[in-house]
Amino acid sequence: MSDKPKTDAAQSGNDYSKTLFLPQTEFPMRAGLPQREPELLKRWEEMDLYGKLRESARGRAKFVLHDGPPYANGNIHIGHALNKILKDVVTKSQQMLGFDSNYVPGWDCHGLPIEWKIEEENYRSKGKPKPNFKDSAAIIAFRKECRAYADKWLNVQREEFKRLGVIGDWDHPYATMNYAAEAQIARELMKFAANGTLYRGSKPVMWSVVEKTALAEAEVEYEDYTSDTVWVKFPVKTGDASTKDASVVIWTTTPWTLPGNRAISFSSKIAYGLYKVTDAPADNWAKTGDLLILADGLAESVFKQARVVAYEKVSDVGADVLKASECAHPLQGLAGGYEFTVPLLDGDHVTDDTGTGFVHTAPGHGREDFDIWMHNARALEARGISSVIPYTVDENGALTEQAPGFTGKRVINDKGEKGDANEAVIQALIARGALLARGKLKHQYPHSWRSKKPVIFRNTPQWFIAMDKDIVDDGVAKPGDTLRARALQAISVTQWVPPAGQNRINGMISGRPDWVISRQRAWGVPIAVFIKDKGDGSVEILQDEIVNQRIAEAFMQEGADAWYAEGAAERFLGDRAAEGWRKVDDILDVWFDSGSTHAFVLEDAQNFPGLAGIRRKVDGGADTVMYLEGSDQHRGWFHSSLLESCGTRGRAPYDVVLTHGFTLDEQGRKMSKSLGNTTDPAKVIASSGADILRLWVCATDYADDQRIGPEILKNVVETYRKLRNSIRWMLGTLHHYHRDEAVAFADMPELERLMLHQLAEQSATVRAAYAEFDYKTVVASLAAFMNTELSAFYFDIRKDTLYCDPPSSLARKAALTTIDIICDAILKWLAPVLSFTADEAWSMYRPDAEPSVHLTLFPLDLGEYRDDALAKKWTLIRAVRRVVTGALEVERAAKRIGSSLEASPMIYLPEAFMGDIFDVDWAEICITSNAMVEILRGNDTPPADAFRLPELADVAVVVERAQGTKCARSWKILSSVGSDAEYPDVSPRDAQALREWKALGGAAA
């Protein structure tokens, strides 16, 4: 019965519409989510839903999703929405799977972006000078401005996240700027000082001239940039006789680093040769007679760049010859500063893909340069070559006095523009006859993700945590027990979702350098240690537990501002103030802050009592800690948290790490305001509701990059509409259900038992998908079940029974019982995804049960409904039904019938089918007024014009018009209409229904 029945009043004179048991519900067809959702949020808050969840789950194993802190700066964007919705789906589904699933939201509050905002809004825009951070009062005042700014945006974002339907401990979030957090961050740093891995060193770091700070890898983006390129001759001064008067040629895209050159790297795996220029233009930098050492595979391209007309190879140059050779610096003689020897070092990083086959090595300006220099430092010192790395560029991007002849020349200016250093160096090379060629190269170059300006590698005093130094525990260092070794081991015992995340972070940890944790800024947790210079460039760190305790207690009471107060050094050092200890002024990298959140959230029972007593599986317990962020956090929060926890606790802070992709527009492009292709979550919520965003998140494969835009959201809305209509129909139908009339499973008709079997299959699929964080499967499976199996099949078939059968009908009661069981399961399964819609429906479905669907568990006892034999039988029945439906469509298209109730199909079945489906009510299943079956035996054949489907060619159908009179109540055309004297215009079934309706007081309720 595909349409809602109306009585044929014109034919019979009787209006039976009020006697039908039609759906009745206050659950509206139009969702009105933008208006309804805030009401539900208010209800959740008033009932303290998060508190009730914790109370109901007391004693269960914990599943803690530890929130990766967003930055407290600006309104949330679609990436935030994706991330927070995913987290909420995790926590809600894990709670409903039977865990105590806590969620404490948090914020990252320190760092340069907020400093920039304060400087811009409170100083630059008003023409005021930037505060002098060496002045105690000034830096504390500035830090208070930063704190207020972060607090403002924390509160804005909190409301925006709540509007997404995210349930958490919003009244007690964590923030890295909270006093207790700052105190614990300082304590975590002190642990690295105590275990011997914290050190101050000289090392090239990525430096933002514009921002005046070192940058972590996660803070760098690669953009197109045009660099000056030079091919430079380094004269061989000692070595094999065959290379006398020759020059080693290097190629670089950073001429300004040449004053910092201390070596040349080559590869013993590359073939090199000695080449002679035999013809070149008179005014050329490459002269006739020049002897040049080059990689054989690159010689042709070098000579072409150098405008050499002709050249010849004189001889091969072996690795032993190169290793024994030493060069002079190409700037030798300039300001008396380049008279040192330049050795040749064998390095694995050298290739002959481009350049000359030799790498100009400036250990203060490149990571690989630094690594090969330090690897050879002891041997170089033995040869009388100083291994000291110069500081050739200062924080302003200007060359220093350690770059003689170029002091004050700028690599990059304060605006991030290219300075005059490159040209000055190039002209000096030309003047000394050391330049072979020059050019320009457009390539990918590192830029700060904040300022969008190019960065440089420069040698600076920074604070580091060693990756490969044996960690001291109780005064003893165990050989091989390094931070890198611990981290790699921890990665191997962590669950990564998707699994590819393991290889990604494993590769990053395997190859990463020591962790630079210092920044030269004002808004952050200070590197709260005291030091003394040791005279060799290194420092001694004060190890005094009493001093450390004073610092931590002060931070707990006053925040980290206490470090900058007047007299702070004397206050913390106490009776050690006269020993010459200096207070470090650098602050910690914000990645160290966020990497320490496990310490001041998951382990702080005083401030977060709901998280007290976590005992993870790694400790023999049953609790689980998950981290969930975008895939970029393999080098960000996952990475820093892993290093921090492994360095202080010997293990990862998490058991499961789940990553999602980035959000793109409908064409797969990165979103940007300039392109006008952004999707504002606030606008989507205002127009369609947060549940639409939630459905979009869960319907996509979050492991990959997701797309969103108007057309995609339109499809999501359509999917939602279908799901909502199914829910609405069930709620309306169950208006007539009384649970004390529930029918036992064994007494149900086959169709109901089939649907409960399918529900049991859904239960297994949905539970497994939720357990595996596979929300795309949850949505796809439920949508298919609700749209295809329920709405288009079961509900359609059972509408006649539900609307028209007498209240005493077993079939009707069984159908209502089945729909009740289905509705209960579906609302619970949808709750983590459609949190508002499911809870609104639940309040109407079970007003006498739990006050929120989120306080329930997923159904556990559906497995008892499995009946694989019945399902197999109905696979055949439904195949036959498809043939009948196809035949009806042909008749409808030809306008020979209107409704399927006007038809009486003749179904021709092979004899082999009858053993399985002999007892089927085909009229009921096919929603026709009547149906006949004819068994084809032996050589019997159906009429030639019978309808068939290729996939079931043994079945044929001929559609005839139904014979009889149209029932004024059910619309069925039956010969039995008129057989009941009291109700002559309806069928006997409908007559009985009318009598029972009348006995009930004339109400279909």
From Swiss-Prot:
<keyword id="KW-0067">ATP-binding</keyword>
<keyword id="KW-0436">Ligase</keyword>
<dbReference type="InterPro" id="IPR014729">
    <property type="entry name" value="Rossmann-like_a/b/a_fold"/>
</dbReference>
<dbReference type="InterPro" id="IPR033708">
    <property type="entry name" value="Anticodon_Ile_BEm"/>
</dbReference>
<dbReference type="Pfam" id="PF08264">
    <property type="entry name" value="Anticodon_1"/>
</dbReference>
<dbReference type="InterPro" id="IPR001412">
    <property type="entry name" value="aa-tRNA-synth_I_CS"/>
</dbReference>
<dbReference type="GO" id="GO:0005829">
    <property type="term" value="C:cytosol"/>
</dbReference>
<keyword id="KW-0030">Aminoacyl-tRNA synthetase</keyword>
<dbReference type="InterPro" id="IPR009008">
    <property type="entry name" value="Val/Leu/Ile-tRNA-synth_edit"/>
</dbReference>
<keyword id="KW-0963">Cytoplasm</keyword>
<keyword id="KW-0648">Protein biosynthesis</keyword>
<dbReference type="GO" id="GO:0002161">
    <property type="term" value="F:aminoacyl-tRNA deacylase activity"/>
</dbReference>
<comment type="function">
    <text>Catalyzes the attachment of isoleucine to tRNA(Ile). As IleRS can inadvertently accommodate and process structurally similar amino acids such as valine, to avoid such errors it has two additional distinct tRNA(Ile)-dependent editing activities. One activity is designated as 'pretransfer' editing and involves the hydrolysis of activated Val-AMP. The other activity is designated 'posttransfer' editing and involves deacylation of mischarged Val-tRNA(Ile).</text>
</comment>
<dbReference type="GO" id="GO:0005524">
    <property type="term" value="F:ATP binding"/>
</dbReference>
<feature type="binding site">
    <location>
        <position position="629"/>
    </location>
    <ligand>
        <name>L-isoleucyl-5'-AMP</name>
    </ligand>
</feature>
<dbReference type="InterPro" id="IPR002300">
    <property type="entry name" value="aa-tRNA-synth_Ia"/>
</dbReference>
<dbReference type="InterPro" id="IPR050081">
    <property type="entry name" value="Ile-tRNA_ligase"/>
</dbReference>
<feature type="short sequence motif" description="'KMSKS' region">
    <location>
        <begin position="670"/>
        <end position="674"/>
    </location>
</feature>
<dbReference type="GO" id="GO:0000049">
    <property type="term" value="F:tRNA binding"/>
</dbReference>
<feature type="short sequence motif" description="'HIGH' region">
    <location>
        <begin position="70"/>
        <end position="80"/>
    </location>
</feature>
<feature type="binding site">
    <location>
        <position position="673"/>
    </location>
    <ligand>
        <name>ATP</name>
    </ligand>
</feature>
<dbReference type="InterPro" id="IPR013155">
    <property type="entry name" value="M/V/L/I-tRNA-synth_anticd-bd"/>
</dbReference>
<dbReference type="InterPro" id="IPR023585">
    <property type="entry name" value="Ile-tRNA-ligase_type1"/>
</dbReference>
<dbReference type="GO" id="GO:0004822">
    <property type="term" value="F:isoleucine-tRNA ligase activity"/>
</dbReference>
<dbReference type="Pfam" id="PF00133">
    <property type="entry name" value="tRNA-synt_1"/>
</dbReference>
<dbReference type="GO" id="GO:0006428">
    <property type="term" value="P:isoleucyl-tRNA aminoacylation"/>
</dbReference>
<keyword id="KW-0547">Nucleotide-binding</keyword>
<comment type="subunit">
    <text>Monomer.</text>
</comment>
<protein>
    <recommendedName>
        <fullName>Isoleucine--tRNA ligase</fullName>
        <ecNumber>6.1.1.5</ecNumber>
    </recommendedName>
</protein>
<dbReference type="InterPro" id="IPR002301">
    <property type="entry name" value="Ile-tRNA-ligase"/>
</dbReference>
<dbReference type="InterPro" id="IPR009080">
    <property type="entry name" value="tRNAsynth_Ia_anticodon-bd"/>
</dbReference>
<comment type="similarity">
    <text>Belongs to the class-I aminoacyl-tRNA synthetase family. IleS type 1 subfamily.</text>
</comment>
